[in-house]
Design a protein with these regions (language model features):
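A short, charged, amphipathic alpha-helix used as a generic interaction element across diverse proteins
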Residues: 21-43
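Short aromatic-glycine-(Arg/Gly/Cys) micro-motifs in beta-strand/loop hairpins
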Residues: 1-16, 43
């Protein structure tokens, strides 16, 4: 079965695929592990895309929905 989420890092609004995730919790852990920056989490099931930001403290916040 294909994992339902894909995680991307965003640098200059260019996505780089970081890998799949089975849940939002696991997707957010991938973003934390990759450190400060902007990320995009995409649902394979719904097509929904959400942007997240990781700060210097390792806090992850949703910044805005893309679709």
């Amino acid at each position: 079965m294909i994992p339902p989420l894909d995680v991307f890092s965003l640098k200059n609004d260019e996505p780089t695929w970081l890998g799949p995730a089975e849940s939002l919790e696991k997707a957010l852990e991938i973003t934390r592990q990759n450190g400060i920056g902007s990320y995009l989490i995409c649902s394979q099931r719904t097509g929904r895309k959400e942007r997240y930001q990781v700060d210097a403290n390792g806090t992850v916040r949703r910044t805005r929905g893309v679709q």
